[in-house]
């Protein structure tokens, strides 16, 4: 006995099935995404440390590994496929993790690997010339990264954007309520 699902967009069908299977829409976990060409791994490590020091139980999905208390595995991809993402968020929730920090690559955004993930917030580090074999040009690359911020499912979202980066300043125009940060612009502030 085999069930077959027909859908015009197989990637959408996959993440919807993953979300339904692992009920990631109702988890008791705050998910934060970090995107940018450079600095995602460093940012997730810093966030993990700060949140742990603040008393949170933290999980991290990123370039080096996927880890949470009692679990660590080498990461074959910066951002895994939807089945793995949703499964791991459910596993973290079952282990009492209350904050998950995730590196979100442009490939993952474009390929719908993080669709259905209940992001509570996101951070943008920078955008430099990379992955143009995939995105064709910087404008397409930027628009893909911006989707993480513009398509966040929660109304109350926390956004942090590097205002020292020219693409970050452009993202701030699209997300005026975001917290801006940077060395050149002074202390973090809302625009």
Region locations from a protein language model:
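Residue-level signal for inorganic ion chemistry
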Residues: 17, 34, 61, 85, ...
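Short beta-strand-centered segment that lines the nucleotide-binding/catalytic pocket of NTP-utilizing
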Residues: 55-69, 104
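Conserved nucleotide-sensing/catalytic segment adjacent to the nucleotide-binding pocket
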Residues: 77-105
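Short, basic phosphate-binding NTP loop
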Residues: 1-33, 43-55, 189
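Conserved lysine of the Walker
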Residues: 40
């Amino acid at each position: 006995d085999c069930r077959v699902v027909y859908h015009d967009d197989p990637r959408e069908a996959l993440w919807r099935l993953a979300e339904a299977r692992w009920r990631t829409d109702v988890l008791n976990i705050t998910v934060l995404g970090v995107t940018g060409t450079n600095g995602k791994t460093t940012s997730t490590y810093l966030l993990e440390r700060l949140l742990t020091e603040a008393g949170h139980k933290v999980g991290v999905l990123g370039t080096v590994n996927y880890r949470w208390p009692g679990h660590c595995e080498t990461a074959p991809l910066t951002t895994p496929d939807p089945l793995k993402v949703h499964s791991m968020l459910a596993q973290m929730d079952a282990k009492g993790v209350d904050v998950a920090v995730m590196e979100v690559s442009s490939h993952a955004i474009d390929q719908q690997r993080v669709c259905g993930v209940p992001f509570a917030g996101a951070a943008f580090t920078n955008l430099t010339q990379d992955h143009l074999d995939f995105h064709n040009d910087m404008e397409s690359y930027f628009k893909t990264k911006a989707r993480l911020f513009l398509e966040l499912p929660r109304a109350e979202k926390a956004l942090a954007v590097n205002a020292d980066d020219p693409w970050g300043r452009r993202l701030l125009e699209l997300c005026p309520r975001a917290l801006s940060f940077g060395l050149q612009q002074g202390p973090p502030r809302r625009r």
